[in-house]
């Protein structure tokens, strides 16, 4: 009797930092930290205001208005909790394109403008913490 083996797809690897693009926001390439310790993804935004079911914000000096898909209470690494507006937008990472829910917050004091959390990468990628920029510039080792 032959047993049917369940095969899992081989997922592409990500480095712990990657270049991503958000076409809807016309961002060009941005460096994102791939953060398996964070459930949600986050994007640096300024002058954030929610008006009805829309959210207005500035990113890299450009004004944007997108559909608000919700708000999420986030406890940051420094222990503070805040409610952040959330958008859904396309993320381009190398040859991969996918929709992701992203919270908006002031990340001006952070090293990179964007975090990609577990919800965005789950089932799509595996993270290789010894590498960076696997899908973009020449790959680097840690």
What are these regions (language model features)?
Residues 1-142:
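Pepsin/retropepsin-fold aspartyl endopeptidases
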């Amino acid at each position: 009797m032959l047993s049917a083996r369940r095969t899992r797809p081989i997922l592409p690897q990500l480095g712990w930092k990657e270049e991503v693009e958000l076409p809807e926001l016309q961002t060009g390439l941005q460096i994102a930290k791939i953060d398996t310790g964070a459930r949600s993804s986050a994007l640096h935004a300024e002058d954030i205001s929610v008006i009805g079911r829309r959210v207005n914000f500035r990113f890299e000096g450009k004004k944007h208005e997108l559909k608000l898909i919700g708000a999420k209470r986030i406890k940051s690494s420094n222990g503070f909790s805040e409610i952040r507006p959330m958008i859904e937008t396309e993320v381009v990472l190398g040859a991969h394109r996918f929709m992701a829910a992203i919270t908006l917050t002031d990340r001006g004091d952070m090293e990179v403008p964007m975090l990609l959390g577990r919800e965005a990468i789950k089932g799509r990628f595996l993270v290789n913490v010894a590498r960076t920029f696997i899908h973009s510039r020449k790959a680097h080792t840690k």
